[in-house]
């Protein structure tokens, strides 16, 4: 059986927000991992335009430094930012007041997703690749993510099974069939 990914040909333009859809096992996550260099291309090649900086959210969730607080987790990665800037970003992802002092070890799945997304939004990436970013998020968390992405001016390629989220974010659809 030939992989459906061997036959993909697309051009993504600046500012597009493309939802990648298809049945489980068709290669959506493989496509994302290939585009960020975590997996080799199965065939052919891909090329990024000039000055493209990618940011990747993996549905498997990033590993955090054990024992660190939510605040420290961001601050250690972005020491040039002051406390107010860090707390503003955390607030956009629903970490308010004492939430920022929780250790990452006690965070729920949804809180870990929100923290990963907050870290991603601080990167100077102009092309976000998001693999199932709404997994583990409750309605309020999804709304916070939608708001952050709607304020984002770069390009987004994302995998999601959440039809409401797709409708709110996507400007185009890439459907992968098996």
Give the label of every model feature segment:
Residues 1-178:
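ABC ATP-binding cassette signature C-motif
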């Amino acid at each position: 059986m030939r992989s459906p990914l061997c036959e993909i040909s697309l051009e993504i333009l600046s500012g597009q927000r493309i939802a990648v859809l298809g049945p489980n096992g068709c290669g959506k996550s493989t496509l994302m991992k290939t585009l960020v260099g975590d997996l080799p291309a199965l065939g052919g090649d891909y090329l990024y335009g000039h000055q493209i900086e990618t940011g990747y959210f993996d549905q498997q969730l990033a590993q955090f430094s054990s024992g660190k607080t939510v605040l420290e987790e961001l601050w250690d990665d972005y020491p040039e930012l002051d406390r107010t800037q860090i707390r503003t970003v955390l607030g956009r992802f629903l970490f308010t007041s004492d939430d920022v002092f929780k250790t990452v070890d006690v965070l729920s799945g949804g809180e870990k997703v929100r923290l990963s997304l907050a870290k991603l939004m601080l990167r100077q990436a102009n092309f976000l690749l998001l693999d199932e970013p709404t997994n583990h998020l409750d309605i309020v968390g999804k709304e916070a993510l939608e708001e952050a992405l709607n304020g984002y001016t770069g390009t987004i390629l994302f995998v999601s099974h959440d039809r409401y989220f797709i409708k709110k974010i996507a400007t185009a659809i890439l459907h992968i069939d098996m």
